[in-house]
Amino acid sequence: DINASMDKYLTEGVFQVLPESLVYIERQQSDGRIRHGLIGMVDLDAYDFTPGSGALIRATEGTVLDRIPPRARVRRNAPIELPHVMLLIDDPDKTVIEPLTAASGEMETLYDFDLMQNGGHIRGYKLTDRQVDAVADALEGLTSDEAMQKKYGVSGVAPLLFAVGDGNHSLATA
């Protein structure tokens, strides 16, 4: 039973709570290419899947409302919730992720292991408080009127910070 497995993981201390943290990820694919990203949390009130929404976090595909109740039922009695949601940013000046790549040596390594089935290798690093603040500032900069004008040639419109690239229904269920 999946809930029993979750309880077991919680009891055994498999998971570590990292309040107010961000985790920088480097995933080396089996072909040698490295993908970079961040793991964190978002304000669910900043998300809206309604077409034409002006929310900071928006869906990139239609949300099928019938898919939400089954997902909610599965999660109802779950002791933990760990859905994957991939959020995309439009950061042409490389202000968010790239500074972290150069500074990963300053971060605490949380994990570093090979993935199964030739999936490559993954490393996760906990950002310092200073780096978390820098990421927050960089993300805020992406929503400025100046940034919207530079990227899209528009101003005075509701900025888009994150586009949901995968996991839209999981985010809608949350």
Please describe what each predicted stretch is:
Residues M116-D137:
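Glycine-rich phosphate-binding "P-loop"
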Residues D1-N118, K126, Q149-Y152:
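N-terminal extension/subdomain marker
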Residues G141-A174:
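Active-site beta-strand/loop microenvironment that shapes enzyme catalytic pockets
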Residues P79, L127, Q131, F162-H169:
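Short, contiguous, pocket-lining structural segments
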